[in-house]
Amino acid sequence: MLVLVSPAKTLDYENKAGTIEHTLPKLVQHSEQLIEECRKLAPSDIASLMKVSDKIAGLNAARFTSWSRDFSTDNAKQALYAFRGDVYTGLDADTLSQQSIERAQKHLRILSGLYGLLRPLDLMQPYRLEMGTRLANIKGTNLYQFWGDVITDEVNLALSEQGDQIVVNLASNEYFKAVKPKSLNGSLITPIFKDRKNGQYKVISFFAKRARGMMVRYILDNNIKTFSGLTEFDAAGYYYCEAESTAQAPVFKREEQ
């Protein structure tokens, strides 16, 4: 089972990672091409392109300038511990056991606008470049055109290395659009999380993001390998709703919080 998640805008480079083990990102040559394009942008261009404040634009201009092809624990941090945000709050990487960390390295991949596809322990220099950014580049006018088949090929490689043909999509639509489902060498499962509010069950972004992280944690801690194993997920009050589910889209519901 290979699990795909989105990155996060919020980064933590202040606190130490939960392990000293690390690997190097595999698609750095592509990242370097994007960095070259980003370095051409003035802070005002970044602010407009990314729809961020002048302060955040200035910070990211500095990050693009200081980015180096040489990765070390001095200028980078393992992706699983660098990202913060709702998904990563649900996952709570800081409390993972060594066994779950090892499973994550094999069975979890993080989609990234700059790095393409990251393993959890891949070192990552700080950046902000969302997959939906319309950054002109040598391959087109956006990052989907830039990455083309590269990310899908890496997902298929990871599938072959980890031993089965199940992809669990816990990423946002923005990021999963960088993957080509018809080219995947496996079956795709996209869990849906619904919370009850005002008498109706609906997908509420904040809760759904945390639920995705909690499901990642559940998969890692329990060594889940099958669809039926996924349906036993019951963290934080969620329960499997068989009546609304399909083999491709299991639905999990929760009562009003």
Swiss-Prot record:
A GO cellular component entry from the record: cytosol
InterPro entries in alphabetical order: YaaA (IPR005583)
Gene Ontology biological-process entries: response to hydroperoxide
Recorded superkingdom: Bacteria
UniProt cross-references to HAMAP family, sorted A to Z: UPF0246 (MF_00652)
Similarity comment text for this entry: Belongs to the UPF0246 family.
Protein name: UPF0246 protein Ssed_1188
Source organism of this protein record: Shewanella sediminis (strain HAW-EB3)
Organism placement in taxonomy: Bacteria, Pseudomonadati, Pseudomonadota, Gammaproteobacteria, Alteromonadales
